[in-house]
Amino acid sequence: MASPDLFPNVSFSHVSVPAAAGASTEVTGGATAVFGGDASTGAPRLSLVWSGETQAKHTLEIDLSDAQIFKLGPTEWLCVSGESEAKDGVEEKSYSRAIKVVLRTEAESKAFYLAFQQWKHRVISGKAGEPLENGLIIGSKSKFDTKIEASSAKMYFHYYGQLLHQQNMLQDFVRTGTYYAAVMENRSDFEGRVVVDVGAGSGILSLFAAQAGARHVYAVEASEMAEHAQRLISGNPSLGQRITVIKGKVEEVELPEKADILISEPMGTLLVNERMLESYVIARDRFLVPGGKMFPTTGRIHMAPFSDEYLYVEMANKALFWQQHNFFGVDLTPLHGSAFQGYFSQPVVDAFDPRLLVSPPTFHTLDFTTMKEEELYEIDIPLNFVASVGTRVHGLACWFDVLFNGSTVQRWLTTAPGSPTTHWYQLRCILSQPLYVMAGQEITGRLHLVAHSAQSYTIYLTMSAKMWGEGAEQGGILQTSTAKLELKEPYYRLSQPQPYVMQQDQQQQQLPSLQPQSPLWDYHYGQD
């Protein structure tokens, strides 16, 4: 095979009814199948080129925009397209044309199918051969397109189509090293298996899977990073010969075979940001064999109330600008309240000291192997904590971990405070009205995440605690604070002062450190 888009020495024949012009054509072993774009319109086409008895070149072209392909055998495919004839400029007759194409080997047959699908879903914007625009695919709307704004998708694919952002993730050695260890420690799950890399990015996870002995890896990537992945994989030929890069969304592409294992890095801030987990679940339903494995297998969102006076004051002070009564002769104070609430609508992304937690954390589990995609549209988590110290509660701290449930080793990737920092950091939702609690007091509430079309979530947080004292025998006075935050617009507080430390009289009841040697870590995170 000369190239992924050219297939020499194929056989083909017409099998259409009623017969189209030239329907009696049958070529055995002497034709060349070429995928490409129309020179004038850029429309994707399959051209079958052969020489006749007089050595004259003949070409049969199939418009892929409305074509379908069906497998007849290991090396045989049926390409069906709709056509119409026109007489005197008037469309007169419509019919379907079916071309049976026979490849030389199963490997070429598989590559032919992949080329058919990739060219069918490709957008040629301008002349053939011009770069494709990020994030655009022709054809009927997929599930991704119906739930995600086109502008958001375009920005998303543009972002991940740049090598500098891929480098940022690759240099997260906690992330990359954990994936590598999870794959290599579970070679038995990969050896001789078919793997699909969902959202392959640079292709690094596909290369890991090939190192672990995968029979074949399909690296599916919708952004322009697919071209970079192809170059990286081609530059590692001993592994790359078992990897096929497919440019497209997992909701739209077709694969020639089912996968034994899916591998992906679909996690965003708070685990669910960017909504790629939904694509991961869709890929499971479309491509994974029954009982197949998923790396990662499950994810957990961890939550605990926190106290951080320094952070609260920092956020509140941001709105002081709007308390000016004479800003070039203008009174800004009418907007102070809105500005104050606006700053508190931003989740804070940073790394914080676990000693700021007011109680042991709880967690909410997402099982990627069984959950439905729709369960990710709205996530409702009840909150119930018991304060370990008496202090002011300034909000809810969140982080996540994921489990690679291999047959040999079960490995966790955690973003917990106190553990090695990742590019995800941790996330905190701040209450504009803090709560006052005493040691042993119950803190209740609700964390409600609602997905939206900008590939993120709106966060609705409610936290409550009872104020004891006069009238406590009747149950006390319930104090409640709420917040509405936008996960897509966080405050990245990556260069911050030392965290606020609780008062000396609070230190005796401090929480155990969230480190592997502590009982709290063992309970929540587990070890190999």
Swiss-Prot record:
Residue ranges of the region described as Disordered: 500-528
Keyword Transcription regulation among record annotations: yes
Bilayer-spanning residue ranges: none
Location relative to the cell: Nucleus; Cytoplasm
A GO MF label: histone H3R17 methyltransferase activity
Domain SAM-dependent MTase PRMT-type stretches: 149-464
Binding site for S-adenosyl-L-methionine: Q166, R175, G199, E221, E251, S279
GO BP: any one term: methylation
UniProt xrefs under Pfam families: PH_PRMT_N, PrmA, PRMT_C
Main location per the UniProt record: nucleus
Domain of life, source organism: Eukaryota
InterPro entries reported in the protein's UniProt record: Arg_MeTrfase, PRMT_dom, SAM-dependent_MTases_sf
SUPFAM superfamilies: S-adenosyl-L-methionine-dependent methyltransferases
Lyase among keywords: no
Catalytic activity: L-arginyl-[protein] + 2 S-adenosyl-L-methionine = N(omega),N(omega)-dimethyl-L-arginyl-[protein] + 2 S-adenosyl-L-homocysteine + 2 H(+)
Main EC class the enzyme belongs to: transferase
Enzyme Commission code(s) on record: 2.1.1.319
GO cellular component: cytoplasm; nucleus
Biased composition range(s): Low complexity: 500-520
Record keywords: Chromatin regulator, Cytoplasm, Methyltransferase, Nucleus, S-adenosyl-L-methionine, Transcription, Transcription regulation, Transferase
Role of this protein: Methylates (mono- and asymmetric dimethylation) the guanidino nitrogens of arginyl residues in several proteins involved in DNA packaging, transcription regulation, and mRNA stability. Recruited to promoters upon gene activation, methylates histone H3 and activates transcription via chromatin remodeling.
Sequence similarity: Belongs to the class I-like SAM-binding methyltransferase superfamily. Protein arginine N-methyltransferase family.
Protein name, per record: Probable histone-arginine methyltransferase CARM1
Top-level taxonomy: Eukaryota, Viridiplantae, Streptophyta, Embryophyta, Tracheophyta
